[in-house]
A protein has these predicted regions:
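Membrane-helix boundary/interfacial segments in multi-pass membrane proteins
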Residues: 1-7, 183-196, 226-267
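Membrane-interface transmembrane helices that cradle and orient dolichyl/undecaprenyl
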Residues: 15-31, 62-71
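Membrane-interface alpha helices of multi-pass inner-membrane proteins
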Residues: 18, 31-46, 87-93, 227
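Short hydrophobic alpha-helices at membrane interfaces in multi-pass membrane enzymes
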Residues: 24-39, 74-85
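Membrane-interface helix-loop-helix junctions at transmembrane boundaries of multi-pass membrane enzymes
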Residues: 69-82, 166-180, 205-235
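Hydrophobic alpha-helical membrane-interfacial segments at the cytosolic entry of transmembrane helices
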Residues: 76-103, 119-124, 225-227
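Periplasmic/ER-lumenal interhelical loops and adjacent helix-loop junctions
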Residues: 97-209
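Conserved small/polar residues in nucleotide/adenosyl-binding loops
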Residues: 276-283
Length: 283
């Protein structure tokens, strides 16, 4: 549920911190933090959020690999990677029973493989996992991405238009009976309880950080940010969505692709915060 989603997300920053510590040479503390918070993430039992942040980890690993290649420190990189792999396995092993039963149960649900043979357009759906239409039902609109900067760019939440004092102050009283059946939101999603908004000032600091912050963390955060935004478009950008549904393991097990914007809500403020650290080309 949504409560466990927030609890899982709360364990993401210290997990990332453990990974960064390991690649900075602090193998013991990096390994301990990673093992502990990977275990707590999985215990929180919102696999979708942990799955999404696995992509963020890949961006971090890729950025540190590029740095190690460039600075000829590959042995240290592989040593840190080995420690992190062991730490992740420890965290997973602590939850192996729960993970196994979730996996076994999912095969008997709508996320498992259908026993029916489909033809025509229906055959284009996934052979196992959720249907494409269901996966992408909650897809963020391409222009709706501007809500990161302007929260009500698409009207805000799916509340009745009649509840907006601003709108009603300019509305024609002749059509007052219609306003209760119209929603303030006019984006591509079926409905929403509110936009994804990170703040104009935070977004300004993020853009500034793209030019000022040095080191591999910056490139990992920038890459993960744009990755999450493009994937959140779902049915509005099907070439990439189709690729992930067809070829990326487990991606077709999760619905509401717009929720991957939790990555951007993590990476944008983090890069903004890095502006307040002492400038150093090392990290």
């Amino acid at each position: 549920g949504h409560i466990w989603k927030f609890i899982t997300l709360a364990y993401v920053p210290p997990t990332i911190a453990g990974i960064v510590l390991a690649y900075r040479g602090k193998l013991l503390w990096g390994g301990i933090l990673t093992a502990l918070f990977v275990a707590l993430q999985i215990t929180s039992n919102h696999v979708q959020m942990s799955y999404y942040f696995f992509f963020v980890i890949l961006f971090f690993v890729g950025a540190y690999f590029e740095k190690a290649w460039r600075t000829k420190t590959l042995p240290q990189f592989f040593k840190a990677s080995a420690v992190l792999i062991v730490a992740a396995l420890v965290g997973i092993a602590a939850n192996v029973s729960n993970l196994y039963h979730t996996y076994a149960y999912s095969k008997e649900t709508m996320r498992g493989k259908s026993e029916l043979v489909q033809t025509g357009d229906a055959a284009k759906q996934t052979s196992s996992g959720l249907d494409r239409d269901y996966i992408t039902q909650w897809s963020y609109g391409i222009d709706e991405t501007l809500t990161l900067l302007v929260p009500n760019f698409k009207g805000g939440a799916s509340a009745a238009l009649s509840q907006s004092e601003t709108a009603m102050s300019k509305a024609n009283p002749m059509y007052s009976s219609l306003y209760g059946s119209l929603t303030q939101y006019f984006g591509t999603q079926p409905m929403t309880s509110g936009p994804v908004y990170v703040g104009a000032f935070v977004l300004f600091l993020f853009v500034l950080g793209c030019f000022i912050v040095k080191g591999p963390l910056k490139w990992a955060l920038i890459g993960a940010t744009f990755f999450s935004i493009v994937l959140s478009w779902g049915k509005n950008f099907m070439p990439l969505t189709d690729f992930f549904i067809d070829y990326v393991p487990m991606y077709n097990k999760f619905r509401a692709v717009s929720s991957i914007l939790v990555i951007a809500e993590f990476t944008i403020p983090l890069l903004a915060c890095l502006l307040y650290t002492s400038p150093s080309p090392r990290d």
